[in-house]
Amino acid sequence: MQIAVMTFRMHAPWVHSLKEKRMIVKSLVAKLQSKFHVSAAEIDEQDTHTIIVIGIAAIVPHHAMADSLMDEISVFIEKNCEAGILEETREIR
């Protein structure tokens, strides 16, 4: 078994309040959990309304599946989130 861990740091300059940010984060996290069956949550910068940091983790049978899943998640976030990705980290444990 492998654990795939990803972190996305994104910039959303049009967001003007924490309430607006919270709606964006909740929607993205729910979509990720539903589509990919992963654990996802906002893990940092909760008090900064223009920066979104999402952590994602999943347990997969082998390394190749972890790579494939992380590629799919990355493409999904690029296509479904208006925020620009500043940084993406990946780790397989």
Residue spans for each PLM region:
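Beta-strand elements of well-folded, non-transmembrane domains
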Residues: 10-14, 34, 58-60
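C-terminal binding/interaction regions
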Residues: 21
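A generic structural signal for short beta-strands and their flanking turns/coil linkers
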Residues: 2-6, 34-36, 50-52, 84-86
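Short, charge-patterned binding micro-sites
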Residues: 3, 41-62, 91
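Amphipathic alpha-helical assembly/interaction segments
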Residues: 17, 26-27, 31-33, 37-44, ...
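Glycine-rich, flexible loop/turn motifs
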Residues: 14, 39, 88
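C-terminal structural segments of small proteins and small subunits
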Residues: 58-93
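Short glycine-/aliphatic-rich beta-strand segments at the starts of folded cytosolic domains
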Residues: 4-13, 18
